[in-house]
């Protein structure tokens, strides 16, 4: 029962994994295809809007040129916010110069940015930089004279006394001292009791050889079987035996077929075939389009 549950769980996980992989693949392909298409569409929309905006600016500048020309003809001295011509981008057409009466002000660009302001206060000091690279070695000093001897000032090192070493081991025992002087003779004491017996003395020297003994009885010879010796080496092989009786007749049916043999070498390549008939003519191509051409610059409403 547990085995069946495990198999069912594995199948469900297999379907879930397949579904997840499919969704991931579709999402990846969608992102690969949709993002460039969306970017291309947004760029196309931006280009179209830019052309429309430039056209509107051009028409507006033309209207203001007519207005200034009318003021010049009528002799009207006026200055309004739009008296200063703005710089147009994308169109090189020059307009009529403004002929106002009291024009003493300076010109400015279309973005409305004035002259640069005063310099700001100095900023805080930056973090210290990294150490520079080591300099090149200096030039070699002049050689000393041959007869000059080194002095104590030539050596600039100081050798302080070293620390005390560890304590050494005990020395060997000294020789025994001289014998002491004889003690005083005891007075008033009698002889003491006898001491215990001393240890046995060392063995004495060996004695001399004794006289030869009488001859013994004559010996008797007894025969007993000895132990068997090791086996000898193997003898030479004997002559071949007589021929055996003929065997019984075999079955009349042939035996089973043997296994298939190895594949033979590849044959020589065949002769080249005859050339085929010419194919059918292809369908005519589609007419050329104007998708690559920019949209015409027309007035709004067309």
From Swiss-Prot:
It comes from the Eukaryota. Residues 79-103, 119-302 are annotated as: Disordered. Keywords: Collagen, Cuticle, Disulfide bond, Repeat. InterPro entries: Col_cuticle_N, Collagen. Residues 114-143, 162-185, 189-221, 226-252, 255-290 are annotated as: Triple-helical region. One of its GO terms (biological process) is collagen and cuticulin-based cuticle development. Residues 194-203, 293-302 have a biased composition (Pro residues). The keyword Repeat applies. Nematode cuticles are composed largely of collagen-like proteins. The cuticle functions both as an exoskeleton and as a barrier to protect the worm from its environment. Belongs to the cuticular collagen family. This is Cuticle collagen 40. The gene is col-40.
